């Protein structure tokens, strides 16, 4: 209700360790099944940091020195010095409170206001001390230097960028090289495919002083948050191993497939394998409660199977080695 009525809104700095301690001691009130701790009754738990109107991104620099706050309705991004923030907390350097939560003095905790452009939202980092902030209103990404605070470059985005991600760009050791703008609108960047359209995400080369747009590709509407990580960090399984499938209705031999009845309840144990289901058919009575358990017995990567049942809005997809059930 009060959003955008004042010069600044707030970022909440939460001492999660203190919250953890309070929760362990049984502090808090159960509301709708969730334990809620009132920060106004627990001094030192939450502090308010004034920030530009409608704060969106709150991002920490790789060295942990700066907290970068971006208010969507202000043309600057604010760099808060974390040491100064902690000093202000210790010294009770407040300008008042909001609902019992102390407000840190803005001038005591900020190092700079960086004039990045209109509609700043989120910030990512490179390994060389540069930061990259998305500009929703300007439809651009601003590149600026931590510590000296000058904006050194901008690259247009098409269009209305929201989030962005650079290679491990919100970690303690960003890789640099590549950045992706996750745009909210595409507006003709692709052939028209109807009322529901993909949005344009754009790959940017950040290896040089000047950023360079190198590729458009298309994602689901309203992309939010993404990560770029080294490929060798991803070590997924490619099939669910047979010996690890502990589903009570899993079967691996066609002789175990079939339907069993218990009163008006029917259990169908089914096998899926290239390219058939066993059993291929079964009969039930009107009013029966039917449970189908399908095991994809493939142990070859990428050999998934699907089962759809007309008129019941049922669609199952089983990955290799997986069992799924549905009751209707």
Give short role names for the model-derived ranges.
Residues 1-260, 265-267, 302, 327:
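Predominantly soluble domains enriched in secretory-pathway, periplasmic, or organellar proteins
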Residues 248-328:
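Extracytoplasmic copper-binding redox domains, predominantly the cupredoxin/blue-copper superfamily
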């Amino acid at each position: 209700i009060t959003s955008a009525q004042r010069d600044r809104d707030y970022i909440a700095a939460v001492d999660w360790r203190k919250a953890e301690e309070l929760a362990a001691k049984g502090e808090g009130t159960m509301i709708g099944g969730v334990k809620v701790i009132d920060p106004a009754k627990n001094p030192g738990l939450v502090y308010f940091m004034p920030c530009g109107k409608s704060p969106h991104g709150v991002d920490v620099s790789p060295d942990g020195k700066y907290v970068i706050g971006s208010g969507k309705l202000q043309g600057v991004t604010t760099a808060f010095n974390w040491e100064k923030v902690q000093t202000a907390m210790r010294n009770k350097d407040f300008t008042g409170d909001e609902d019992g939560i102390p407000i840190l003095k803005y001038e005591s905790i900020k190092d700079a206001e960086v004039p990045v452009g209109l509609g700043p939202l989120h910030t990512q980092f490179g390994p060389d001390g540069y930061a990259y902030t998305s500009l929703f209103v300007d439809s651009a990404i601003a590149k600026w230097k931590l510590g000296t605070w000058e904006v050194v470059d901008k690259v247009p985005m098409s269009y209305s960028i929201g989030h962005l991600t650079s290679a491990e760009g919100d970690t303690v050791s960003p890789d640099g090289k590549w950045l992706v703008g996750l745009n909210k609108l595409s507006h003709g960047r692709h052939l028209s495919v109807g009322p529901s359209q993909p949005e344009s995400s754009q790959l940017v080369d950040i290896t040089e002083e000047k950023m360079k747009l190198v590729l458009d590709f298309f994602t689901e509407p309203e992309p939010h948050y993404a990560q770029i990580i080294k490929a060798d960090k991803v070590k997924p399984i490619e099939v669910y191993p047979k010996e690890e499938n502990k589903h009570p209705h899993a079967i691996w031999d066609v002789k175990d497939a079939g339907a069993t009845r218990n009163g008006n309840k029917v259990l169908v144990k089914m096998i899926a394998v290239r390219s058939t289901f066993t059993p291929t058919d079964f009969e039930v009575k009107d009013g029966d409660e039917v449970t189908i358990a399908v095991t994809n017995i493939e142990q070859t990567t990428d050999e998934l199977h699907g089962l759809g049942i007309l008129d019941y809005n049922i669609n199952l997809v089983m990955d290799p080695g997986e069992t799924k059930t549905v009751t209707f």
